[in-house]
Amino acid sequence: MESQQLSQHSPISHGSACASVTSKEVHTNQDPLDVSASKIQEYDKASTKANSQQTTTPASSAVPENPHHASPQTAQSHSPQNGPYQQQCMMTQNQANPSGWSFYGRPSMIPYTPYQMSPMYFPPGPHSQFPQYPSSVGTPLSTPSPESGNTFTDSSSADSDMTSTKKYVRPPPMLTSPNDFLNWVKTYIKFLQNSNLGDIIPTATRKAVRQMTDDELTFLCHTFQLFAPSQFLPTWVKDILSADYTDIMKILSKSINKMQSDTQEVNDITTLATLHYNGSTPADAFEAEVTNILDRLNNNGIPINNKVACQFIMRGLSGEYKFLRYARHRYIHMTVADLFSDIHSMYEEQQESKRNKSTYRRNPSDEKKDSRTYTNTTKPKSITRNSQKPNNSQSRTARAHNVSTSNNSSGPDNDLIRGSTTEPIQLKNKHDLHLGQELTESTVNHTNHSDDELPGHLLLDSGASRTLIRSAHHIHSASSNPGINVVDAQKRNIPINAIGDLQFHFQDNTKTSIKVLHTPNIAYDLLSLNELAAVDITACFTKNVLERSDGTVLAPIVKYGDFYWVSKKYLLPSNISVPTINNVHTSESTRKYPYPFIHRMLAHANAQTIRYSLKNNTITYFNESDVDWSSAIDYQCPDCLIGKSTKHRHIKGSRLKYQNSYEPFQYLHTDIFGPVHNLPKSAPSYFISFTDETTKFRWVYPLHDRREDSILDVFTTILAFIKNQFQASVLVIQMDRGSEYTNRTLHKFLEKNGITPCYTTTADSRAHGVAERLNRTLLDDCRTQLQCSGLPNHLWFSAIEFSTIVRNSLASPKSKKSARQHAGLAGLDISTLLPFGQPVIVNDHNPNSKIHPRGIPGYALHPSRNSYGYIIYLPSLKKTVDTTNYVILQGKESRLDQFNYDALTFDEDLNRLTASYQSFIASNEIQQSDDLNIESDHDFQSDIELHPEQPRNVLSKAVSPTDSTPPSTHTEDSKRVSKTNIRAPREVDPNISKSNILPSKKRSSTPQISDIESTGSGGMHRLDVPLLAPMSQYNTHESSHTSKSKDFRHSDSYSDNETNHTNVPISSTGGTNNKTVPQTSEQETEKRIIHRSPSIDTSSSESNSLHHVVPIKTSDTCPKENTEESIIADLPLPDLPPEPPTKLSDSFKELPPINSRQTNSSLGGIGDSNAYTTINSKKRSLEDNETEIKVSRDTWNTKNMRSLEPPRSKKRIHLIAAVKAVKSIKPIRTTLRYDEAITYNKDIKEKEKYIEAYHKEVNQLLKMKTWDTDRYYDRKEIDPKRVINSMFIFNRKRDGTHKARFVARGDIQHPDTYDSGMQSNTVHHYALMTSLSLALDNNYYITQLDISSAYLYADIKEELYIRPPPHLGMNDKLIRLKKSLYGLKQSGANWYETIKSYLIQQCGMEEVRGWSCVFKNSQVTICLFVDDMVLFSKNLNSNKRIIEKLKMQYDTKIINLGESDEEIQYDILGLEIKYQRGKYMKLGMENSLTEKIPKLNVPLNPKGRKLSAPGQPGLYIDQQELELEEDDYKMKVHEMQKLIGLASYVGYKFRFDLLYYINTLAQHILFPSKQVLDMTYELIQFIWNTRDKQLIWHKSKPVKPTNKLVVISDASYGNQPYYKSQIGNIYLLNGKVIGGKSTKASLTCTSTTEAEIHAISESVPLLNNLSYLIQELDKKPITKGLLTDSKSTISIIISNNEEKFRNRFFGTKAMRLRDEVSGNHLHVCYIETKKNIADVMTKPLPIKTFKLLTNKWIH
């Protein structure tokens, strides 16, 4: 606005420059209203300082900081205008002003404002100047500038000093709104203060210091007019100005008062809202304070009505006065006076009670007689958590005040109900009654009454939020509710047995009920006034009655002692009994930690010790109530049963007669354990333990030997530690009489330090019980930890140290404290603890290369003693490190799931437990660049030699006779022949192919499993109790772990625990590195199998129910309850048998160690649970050896005639290079050439059949006019690139007929001779399987057709020439093609376009979009595969009509019309199908396999044992380089091509259970080691043994006319080379398996969840395409389901929270998956891992697991 004014009017005529005024901003935290004399000098100094820092010159003017300031412009001189005030402009400075005078000094034109028309307004003349003040001392405005030293005198002097540097004060902003006037006044007052006019401004507390002058008044008026336009002034300001325009000071004074009044109002409201009164001050003072506040607010125009005022007052009441909240909050017409009357009454009664408190004080001797857990010396308060509320991070809080004694003081915590001024009913004893009340004791025998309790009455409690009662006699509708936990004021838990209703029947026949909690662990029955108020019942202590809000009296109140009571006669009894309450089944709370998890977390300590520790806070972070103890009583830990098996218990208290009482750390017990044999040299063989007699604090130290100096070093260390850390001196050390303690060196050391050695007497083992029991306990823990984690034996002392840390933190049942508490140390924070052996990933600070993985798999051992880190074992580095740079590996539970643990994993519990600690670590981490070489905090403590441990029973290696026979090619001459070594590059592209499932270079594996000590009798004691207790409450997440060994075989016996095996490698017994494990019978075998994903376990009675598959419902994907049931129904899922009790055989001895190999195989791989162990035995069941192939391939060269020749050059093959070259393999030739079939064929009969087939083919070619027979071309006349070589090929068809085919050599066809954009389409196998499945469900007729010489019906557009057939004898001539000859690049596409056009135009068909070669109309569906057609229709006549039309154009043969109602056999595209309409369909290849497999020259074992699985877990492909002769290598590759080619053909047709093994071996075609060949033979042997198996379909009988398409997905995390994951999917239509896929993930996944997401995302596109196909072929509605055993994946899919995807590698894929699931209406359901049939697609499985998952759909 100001800029516009400057541009519209001419500048003033005086001055040569227009300088902008700037100043330093005044601090915003300074209050401009504080204008007291003490602040004036401060503002003056600030103004002077600000002015001294700003300069303005004519050449450069400062940019104005105020947006209302005019931009600097050059002033121009003009002659004065005629008449006064004809120009308007902003008041501008024409020259610099002296310090102390701001914003005037030269004539200025002030713009007119409406109120300038006032008669009181006196405008200045055009040449008049602003007032000038005389330069006198003491005048603030006349202070000369320190820079110039001049005083502002006149305009001429000012003009002469125009160029001098002056300081200016920032003007106030323009007023823009009436609502902002008070804020503007603040800035205006600040402006006046900075202009040295602060002393003329009055404040709310004092008048102005001096009177203003006329010049100052003119200045105020002009500046006020300038910056406060009248249109923006408030009404009250305009009223003042209308009366006296110059009364600016009145406006400022009133504004200051208003602002201070507003501040006081805010303070009053804040004080009123934060009132607090507990009786510590007189009630009169409290009333006066509140009344004054209410009066001030009312006077300031803020009236507070009675209701609001009472609410403020009641909110501030605490202590005993809190009761008034409940007594008065229901009153509608409540007044402040009434409320204060009650407060005065309670205050007077409180004072009276204090004076007479000795009368009611409880006798201290009576307190000692109270033997209850809750002594009730103070009032306990209870906190209630309702775990049934999902997504509620804050617990519900309840206060249950349990009072048994009178309170000695008043305060906020003493929430008792006091009497009023009216005399209450006083009972001096239990027999004294008033008001005619009857004290009738309930017939129920109460427990634990307090002496001051009034029997038969309920204690009224004003502070309790819940009602508690000890007897079940009055509880209605009782049910257990363990989710509600109550604690008293001392934070002690009050166990709650049940929850129910407490029903009242009052004296006016009023009936009501409130909720009540049942517990026998309280001193009184508590009645919560809070819950009574919720049902409109209040306690009036002036009348001593319970009444309703309308004043209706319900029951009298009795005062007995210090408390108020209500009789139980108003309670209605129930029929429930106390045993019924106590025996109600406790349901599982999902928010609680399962006891097995805590049991394992705390080193497998017993439940009693853990409970004592949690109750006494020796274990911190969570409470006893946070653990589900429902299974603790009958829970049997299998690892504890094995690791802690003992003969008998020690005698308790046996040492008391040998010693006196000592102070802490004065009496120590010590003992040495060892040696432990068969360990690396770096691992300790002994340990020495110390136990303090008083505190029971334990220390353990490792020892490598028992020499004197080693023992002395430990004693020196422990004594110094106790002296420095605990300021104590050891007086006595009790030891046995071992030589390590009785030697002279140690004796002198003890004597020198004044320590008395106390030795045990001979044959008195009881005297040394403390040390012996500690060693036994620690060893039990050690065995249990190693058994549970599966870590190698050389880490045994780490398990001892972990146990010691935990044991020192567990409370003793006898002392109720832990050793750490006795020693004065803080409790152990369990959030910093990890389970022993927990898989983690440790950051590699210095990798081998920038592309090398930065994470190293490891296993957590125990917290570090020397840092805040954790000791972690890294198998790949053979080290233990001390580091904080680790991440817990999700889904990994080491060997926790070995015994199934009732199908428990604890990922969610562990995440929840360590969340705060991890967040603390994360918040204190320093971000560092990955490219910098920074010193790591890794402390490599020991170099561990990881050589395999030798088992105690040496295993003999089984060698077949052929194994000892050396190959005939390895002769003396071969050593003298030079070798041509060919090496492949070491590093190759990891993405070799879509199904790359090969081992990479050696990586770390799971360390070997420790041996288990046998008992003295040579075997484990037989356990008559089951090792496993079913716990169906717990859900689990996917978990996988790696453990590698070659010493594994299948076990014939099988328990339900094995159903979760995953990622178990293929095994073979023929390899050179294999070791044969002695046979073990079923009765003598203990299954030790690591599960991939322990799943939800249910009770045996529900093993066959649908509850094994738990659907996850969402509003988007599952709109109806029965949708999930319909999806799961009819699926060929396995029926899980009930889990039998697992018993250990008497002959059970010891487990052989797992010989860990540092490899990463595709048949198991790192991160997978693929290890299991059998027990050594001389016997072995028949099925245990069924995967063994006795025929060795060492006789290979005996069949080769070239073996008689001198050895040739050898070729060295590297595994990775061979894998990379797999995709470039040329297919092997399965047909015969002309010379092989006819010219040189010595089989006369076969030769004649081939000749007949040859002539038949030639006649067909001539009949179809395949080439131009009118002219033969000379070869020289034709462009060579248009000449196509041709040949005859011969083969024998499946039906036994001999076939000849004249084909072109399309493999050498020039690119210019065909259109590369044309596609040769055939029906997709999934389309065929879908059509077959729909045909079975809809009773379709299936007709099979064949079109002879189909390609020859398609014309060829290009100009191509071929050589004539051989029988014509014209080798130098060429003929021009007219038809699409077989073999040409374009022939398939030409035929496809030809037949497609005919079917659409002539037969009325249409092709299904997205599914080539699938045609349909309203009646018929056609699947086309080159020249084979399969027709499906409801009416057979529809098929016949299509056939007639086809015969009109093509030579069509009906292979099978399909008109019979009996079983019909088809041979469709290699599948042998048995079909009976409306009943079943069976798909197999028995006849074809019976014919083909024997011709493969595979060493079959037809009379031997049959294989029960395609491969066995435990063996890894040796990655060492091969060195083979060139010819030998080519022959083996050729054989591998034949074998894998046949297996792939079978697997992708219908044997989907073999796809994992097929894909794995397919990657090793160019790496034909003896091991790979033997594994391939084993696969072919299994196919041969199961050649009669069929894919079985039965007609579905859906409840609704709908189709159900389901995909079951699974992933095996990180079990492939380069840490890639294997994914597998199985597709089912109406419960029938129609396809499967097993492949390696295209990207490296970082977690099991990401692998599962990748697997599901790979399945969704095909699922959607199949859905479209089904809807096109069958117009029924379709339901699409997606089943996975990963709950975390389901949670991500159904969640609407997108923040969890941030900083996640799989965020994009997960978001896309969520969109696809939502957009395509997919129903995402959970399936147990035990029932996940897709498991066979991702990993090798044990025999019984494999059978269990496949026997319902392949048999």
UniProtKB/Swiss-Prot annotation:
Annotated localization: Cytoplasm; Nucleus
Catalytic residues of the enzyme: 461
PROSITE patterns in the cross-refs: ASP_PROTEASE, INTEGRASE
Disordered: annotated segments: 1-86, 131-171, 350-420, 956-1120, 1146-1172
Catalytic reactions of this protein: DNA(n) + a 2'-deoxyribonucleoside 5'-triphosphate = DNA(n+1) + diphosphate; Endonucleolytic cleavage to 5'-phosphomonoester
GO cellular component: cytoplasm; nucleus
Residues at which Mg(2+) 3 binds: 1610, 1652, 1685
Marked site positions, Cleavage: 401-402, 582-583, 1217-1218
PTM description: Initially, virus-like particles (VLPs) are composed of the structural unprocessed proteins Gag and Gag-Pol, and also contain the host initiator methionine tRNA (tRNA(i)-Met) which serves as a primer for minus-strand DNA synthesis, and a dimer of genomic Ty RNA. Processing of the polyproteins occurs within the particle and proceeds by an ordered pathway, called maturation. First, the protease (PR) is released by autocatalytic cleavage of the Gag-Pol polyprotein yielding capsid protein p45 and a Pol-p154 precursor protein.
Integrase-type zinc finger-like: annotated segments: 583-640
Molecular function GO terms recorded: aspartic-type endopeptidase activity; ATP binding; DNA binding; DNA-directed DNA polymerase activity; RNA binding; RNA-directed DNA polymerase activity; RNA-DNA hybrid ribonuclease activity; zinc ion binding
InterPro entries: Aspartic_peptidase_AS, DNA/RNA_pol_sf, Integrase_cat-core, Retrotran_Ty1/copia-like, RNaseH-like_sf, RNaseH_sf, RVT_2, TYA
Biased composition (Low complexity): 153-165, 960-969
Residues binding Mg(2+) 1, per UniProt: 671, 736
Domain of life according to the entry: Eukaryota
Domain Reverse transcriptase Ty1/copia-type: 1338-1476
Residue numbers covered by motif Bipartite nuclear localization signal: 1178-1212
Record-annotated RNase H Ty1/copia-type domain positions: 1610-1752
Composition-biased stretches (Basic and acidic residues): 363-372, 1038-1053
Residue ranges with Polar residues bias: 1-23, 48-60, 71-86, 131-152, 373-412, 1005-1015, 1054-1082, 1095-1106
Keywords from the UniProt entry: Aspartyl protease, ATP-binding, Cytoplasm, DNA integration, DNA recombination, DNA-binding, DNA-directed DNA polymerase, Endonuclease, Hydrolase, Magnesium, Metal-binding, Multifunctional enzyme, Nuclease, Nucleotide-binding, Nucleotidyltransferase, Nucleus, Protease, RNA-binding, RNA-directed DNA polymerase, Transferase, Transposable element, Transposition, Viral release from host cell, Virion maturation, Zinc, Zinc-finger
Note, other: Retrotransposons are mobile genetic entities that are able to replicate via an RNA intermediate and a reverse transcription step. In contrast to retroviruses, retrotransposons are non-infectious, lack an envelope and remain intracellular. Ty1 retrotransposons belong to the copia elements (pseudoviridae).
Record text about domains: The C-terminal RNA-binding region of CA is sufficient for all its nucleocapsid-like chaperone activities.
Subunit-structure text: The capsid protein forms a homotrimer, from which the VLPs are assembled. The protease is a homodimer, whose active site consists of two apposed aspartic acid residues.
Name this protein carries in UniProt: Transposon Ty1-NL1 Gag-Pol polyprotein
Classification of source organism: Eukaryota, Fungi, Dikarya, Ascomycota, Saccharomycotina
The encoding gene: TY1B-NL1
